[in-house]
Structure formats: C-alpha cells, structure tokens
Amino acid sequence: MSAADLDYFSEDEQREIEAELDTGFKDIEEKYAVTAQKGFETMLVVDNIPIVDGSKKQRLLERLRQTFAKVGAPIEEESIDMPWNAAAGTNKGFVFLTYPDVKEAENAVHTLDGVSFGKNVLHVNRFGDIQRFASMPVGEGDLPSGWKEKEYIEKDYLRNWLGDIAGRDQYVTFWETEVTVWWNGRNGTAEALKGPDGKPVKNSKWGELYLQWSTMGTYLASLHRVGVALWSGPKLDGPIGVNVLRFTHPNVRLIQFSPCENYLVTWSEDPLPNYENHPNAALRDTFGPEDEGNQYVIWDIKTTRVLRTFPGDKSAIGVDDTQSRMSWPTFKWSADDSYIAKCNVGAGISVYELPTMGLLDRKSIKIEGVQDFEWCPMSQKDLIARQEGKGKECVLAFWTPEAQNQPARVNIMAVPSRTILRSKNLFNVSECKFYWQSQGDFLCVKVDRHARKAKSKKATSCNLEIFRMREKDYPVEVLEFKDYVPQFAWEPSGTRFAIVLQAETNLPSVSGASTKYSIDFYQLDSKKGDFIAIKHLDSKMANTLVWSPKGRHIALATIGSSSKYDIEFWDLDFTIDERREAAELGANVTMLGTGEHYGITEIAWDPSGRYIATSASTWRQSPEPGFSIWDFKGQQLLHESRDRFKQFLWRPRPPTLLSKDQIKKVRKELREYSRQFDEEDAAEENRGSAEKLAQRRREIGEWNAWRTRNNDRLAFERENRGKSKAKIDVKGQEARVEEWVEELIDETEELSM
C-alpha cells in the first residue's frame, strides 16, 4: 500500500494499518502453525541397519525385535516399517518404529541409541525432529541463526620431529618453572629445539605442575590447575583447537593416554560440582548435572569431547590416605583402543566399548573375589589385522585369591566373547602380578607365596608361571624360587627376562646398611623348549632392571638407597665372533661398564636404545638434583646438576613403518650404512674442530687488536703530556735462587754390644 492510498484514512486509522503491516501475518502463522512433533510423538527412526536382500529380511526383523526387547524397548513386528529399495532388491538401512504411547517412545530413544547390532551401532531419532530439521528455513549457502562458521586452519604435520636428518631423539628438561625441549646429539651434545625465527622454543605455560608425553610422542601434555593442555606440531605450539588442545578438569592431578593416542583419562581428587549455573562457560559446556560428584573423565582427544565421567572408588580410596591406597591406572586400555576396563575389586570387571563408552553387553563381567587384571599387548601385525577386522579377540588376564576351600586362580579371558581360554589353580598365594611380553607372546604371572601354615601372609618365596600365548592350549611353565622376587622384566620383543632376587625379606632395617640382591637372566632354549638360567650375578646392590627398547642391552641401577647409587651396563650378546648363534647360551653376557649418579631417582632409555638417562628429582628429595646422559656402554656423555630440577623425559617414538623384509635388508647392508655414517660422523667432528679452531683464532686476533689499540693510545697520551716511557732496570732486581735436593740412597743402623 502506497502513501497516496493512506491519505483516504484518518491519522488513527493510518497508525493501525501501519502497525498491521509491520506485524504482517505473524499472529495468523502462530495461530495456525503445525508442530512438527504433533501426530508423530510415538514414531522413531532407527538408522544404521545392516543392508540385506529379500531372503534375509524376515530374519533381520526378528533379530531387531530380539535386540530391542533385550535392551528394554520391546516392540511388535507389525509396528516396524522397513523401507525397501525395489530397484536394488535391498532395504534402505533404516526402519520406522511406532510405539503405543509417548512414554514408551521416549524410553526407546534413550535405550536404543548407541546399541551395538553386530558390527553396526544403531542411531535413534524422533521422526518429528527429522521433519523439523528438514523444514528449517535455510537458504542455499546460509547457516541457521546462531551458528558461527569457523575458518579452516590447516594442521601441521604432528610427527615432524621424526624427519630429523641426523635421526636424533628429543627430550624435555623441567627446572624450576623453565621447560626446554632438546635434540640429543652425538656424544651427548645437546641442541635446543628452535622455531622458524631461530630462537629456542619455550613456553611459560608448560611449567605449572608437571609434564607427560603421549604414548607415541605426538603430544606434550602439561597439567594446570584448570585442566590439561596438549601441545603438538613443529614448535609444540600453535592455534588453539588445532595444535593446542584443551581439556577442562579443575585440579587435575593424574592423566593417562590410550596406546593409540585416541583417548585420555584425567583424575582429580576433588569431585566435580554442579556447573549448571557456573559463570565459566567452558565448565558449563563441558560438564552437566549428571557429572556431579565424579572424579574420572574419559576424553576423545581429537574432538576434545567428554565421553563419560566416573566417580572415585570409595572402597579403594581412603579419606585420610588417598595417595597410599589409590591404585593407578584405575582404567586400563586394550592394545587397539577398542575397550577400556576397570576392576571392581571383589566383584568383577567393567569393560566399556569405545567410543560409545557403553558397557560391553550392557553388563559388567561378574568375577567373585577378583583382585586385578591386565590387557594383553599386541604386535604391529596383530594391530593391523584388528584394524582390518581379521584379527583375534582382545585378551585379558585376571586373578582371584583363595576363598574357603577354593584355590587362588589365574584366568585368561577373550573379549568380547568372555571365553575363558586358560585357567591355573594356585595355592598359598599372597599376591599376583602380571608381566606381559611386549608382543603378547608370553605372560609371566609372578606369584608371591607365604608359608603353608604361617599366621602371616607376608610373601617369603615366589613362583613364576609363564604362559605361552602363541601355542595351542596355552601351556604353562613353572619356575620356583625359595627367595622373594621384587623385580621382573621381559626383554622387549625377545625371549629373555631378568629377575632380582632378595634372600631374606624380614630382616630389620639397620641405619646405613644396604640390602644385597642377586640377579638372574633367563632365556628360552629353542632346543629343549624351556626357560633356562643363563647367568647369575651374586651380591649386587642393584634393585632396578631397565631393558633397552631394542633388547640385548640392560642397565642395573640402585635406586632408593641412601648410600649406594651404582649403575651397571650389560650386553647379553657381546662377542667379537660374528657367528653368535654358535656360542652357548649365556656365554656372551658381559658387563660393558659401570657408573654412579649421586641421588639417582629415575632411569630411562631413549627410544633408539643408544643412550640412557639417569635423573635425580627434587620432588623425590634427592640430595643433588640433576641429570646425566650415558651411552649404552656406560660412558657418561653429559652431566647437569641444577637445584630444583624436576623432570627429564625422553620423547617416545611410534612403531616403525618398515616391514620385516625391509628391516632384514637394512641389517644385511648394515656395514655399508655404517661406513656412510662413520664418514658423516668424521665430517661432523672435523667441522666441529675446524669451527672451534677458527673461533679461537678469531678471539686471539680480537685480543691482539685490542691490545695494539690500547698500546697506541697510551703512547699517544704519553707523548702529548711530554712524558717519556719509563725505563726499568731489572738487572738490580735479579736474585739467584739455589735449591738443594738431598736423596737418601741407603740407611744403616749399627748396634753397639
């Protein structure tokens, strides 16, 4: 309506007409609007149904009905409508469900969503929601109101440090509040990690609490009072949400990465409050009312999303002695990140599927009296097979103590089928500990045993129950020891292990006295098929065993003593004969060197197995905080003593991408590669020597130039003042100094009678 048309109306009528025009048809639209949910409140859409042909349609419907009834959302077959693709002769991958009333439909939405159906995971939506989203008034290329489009930022290559030309490893040092990332060079030379500007990479935010690398070295985790930050990329920094990931969990104290770096567990001793009305938006968006009172948070790393939260175990964690009674890690990952499990001591094991975090088969595995469990690791071949859907089931081992007339028992179970693969009865058991070989080939159960009729159940002897996981029926070999075994360690990817033996465990502690141990090395005899002792070391002070990641070399360290800080470096295959296989087992076990690190609290090999680091942390009350780097032969390459030194951490490496054939080829041509590396090392050494010589010559030249300038200036000033250079007579000041040296050649003593 034009302004000319309004001239025929009065001013009041014109105002009413303008108001109606401004309002438009809003009141009419609201009056006659059709709600998308109206009439469809009881109808649901279930997506991700397997695609089948006509011959399997009825069977699929029956299985769907059984699954729905099993999880608590039963429905009649007449109420299931399966759309059909007539051209392809198959279903379309979704079904419509119509329940009798709204209450049952709402129950089905919450019950069925995320349910596993074979290899598929069902997704449930209300039919009205789908209608509403489909009819949203959004133009082409537009976004709904309230949505913000984020600019795409390309992520840096997260494993760029592996491309170092010299093949160097990295490590982190944490001193006071200063954190530095270093390259570990040849002969202990350290070079700080530098950014594109050539300056060392440093971040003041790293040193608030403590640091931890992820399992494959992709992320550096720093703990803060408000949560956890993961840093990645060439500079371990960058845009938030891309190279820097934040996980909000106030007062977090402990974290744990999954083996494949997909998930993260965080724990705080303070239960989560209700953040529904909290002023901090990050806390409101992260946690809901259902998370109140929980202490554990399971995260998806890539999306920084909370998968699930759990309360603390009140039975395992006391109010006054949290640190002494808490067992960490509480949650344990399967090797392929498929499952995460928690031991409910005395009741059972709760296994959760990832990423849905739903209980496996919607119920825990009930195991009366269960005390502990461990997942079986996998070789790279097994992991690839699992990813392709061809691998075997995951495996875990657990143990139950003696109860009434029942013996203690170790069980090996397959997951998800819950099939018991092997059981072994045990007697007079104080405690069991599981030690898996890194490839999952062997499982050693260290059984601490007490005397049969002893009143105290303190362990005085030990059995090693070794299960062979690659053989039929999982045979068990038993090694018995009259002494207590405080330490056990498998050789990575090998068939050898080392143990520490302690003769008497009940001796009173004497001030200044040190406990002596013996150390045994065992190896699988390929001819006899048994594990046999290949070397015995007696009267040793070492109580810690640390194998090289590549096997063969092992370090024996004395940690926790107030008077001894010895380190021994051993080679189990040392020989000058290339045909090592001809030698007897144990004949080549040789000590390469010894060392000492005063106040040592930790020891760790680098991923290459060429270097080993010992550190003394001020957190553990070490008298001389600092760190040292040694080569595998025991030669100390670097030592740094610093007050308030806290952490030394090697950066882990992911598994090699080389196949077995490629590795064999490299080993076959190792001499050629060694010659090339020796030439590069010599060139580097010469370059370093030439640089030092040039620097010294430059410094001497600068000194001589400075001295000449000052002499010329002094002579010029003396001449201007009319003074001549003083002549000093040094002849009169000369003194002759003589030194008499008496040498006793023989001494005779005569006695007069």
UniProtKB/Swiss-Prot annotation:
Residues 723-753 form a coiled coil. It holds the Pfam family eIF2A. Disulfide bonds: none annotated. It is found in: Cytoplasm. One of its GO terms (biological process) is translational initiation. Keywords: Coiled coil, Cytoplasm, Initiation factor, Protein biosynthesis, Repeat, RNA-binding, WD repeat. One of its GO terms (molecular function) is translation initiation factor binding. GO terms for cellular component: cytoplasmic stress granule; eukaryotic 43S preinitiation complex; eukaryotic 48S preinitiation complex; eukaryotic translation initiation factor 3 complex; eukaryotic translation initiation factor 3 complex, eIF3e; eukaryotic translation initiation factor 3 complex, eIF3m. Gene3D superfamilies: 3.30.70.330, YVTN repeat-like/Quinoprotein amine dehydrogenase. Belongs to the eIF-3 subunit B family. Component of the eukaryotic translation initiation factor 3 (eIF-3) complex. HAMAP family: eIF3b. This is Eukaryotic translation initiation factor 3 subunit B. The gene is PRT1.
